[in-house]
Amino acid sequence: MKFLSYLVLVTISLGAVSNPSTGQDAKPEDQNAVSAKRKPSSMMEDSPVTFPERGALPAKYGRDVKTESYPVEKDYFLFSSPCRSLELIEKIQTEMPTGEFTPPPTDWKYLARTRQVLTEGGDLHVLGLGDSIVNDTFRSAWLAKLAAAYPKANIRGTVYVRGGGGCRHYRFEDRIQKYLVPLKPDLVFIGGISQGKDYEAIRDVIAQIRDALPEVEILLATGAFGTTDPRRPDLLAAAQHSGSSDYGMELKKIAAQLHCGYLDITTPWAQYIRSTDLHPHRFYRDRVHANEWGEQILSKILLSFFEVSR
């Protein structure tokens, strides 16, 4: 399907362009359970990029769409998405290195309402739940591209994240009931690199969401970026967030058992980076997180996953 290059209605307003020097320092703060200090990356051995000791490299492009933040407890962040316009996304994608990947398979069995809204119209509120990798995924503004591709649908997004955040954090203190349920999302995206193979917590969060919102659809996704070298299939097969590891197999099993969609985002992400013949850090802003180019890889993967004609 050809993705149309015009804006459609979203439930956020346009704002001033963010300062490019701070654009990548968006919420949440750059911290994760999988950090360079805890787990040094082998990618540093041949990296052509010098990262700051603290913080991230300055962004070339900031955000040109104003987002709305909502009250939430300390160290957690809750705000609207997307934060970039189609024009800015196009500029970033035009400049980024071209790569290739095999589109991940899409089984619409447990995402039937989402598919119906995309093709026939209606409201689709997508909520991203997880860590700073989930934040980066939604900062790619893939929802703006999705809205342009399916103009009959009224698509909006919300991001609920914590640095290093996984379901083991969201399951407690009534966080799902206090902060997620009142937003009444239609589709919840649970992903990132910080789940820590806590499968009980993932199941518990799904149950809490479903108890309050029985019609909600849920998409479970494996992780991307972090410190694992995507050029090394053997390392990916051992990574705690990877679609090619036992984590991916278990997450897929949970998705089938609990009637959720499943997305292995790890494999196409690694394929894209390898196909460019560039060092992976060309797509990073620090030792763990994506820069603007890296975020757009995630956007391309998600857009291919939600291709209804496949």
Whereabouts are the PLM-identified features?
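Catalytic His-Asp segment of secreted/periplasmic serine-dependent ester chemistry enzymes
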Residues: 226-310
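A short beta-strand-loop structural module common to alpha/beta enzyme folds
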Residues: 153-167
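Second-shell loop/turn segments in exported
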Residues: 127-134, 164-166, 192-196, 237-238, ...
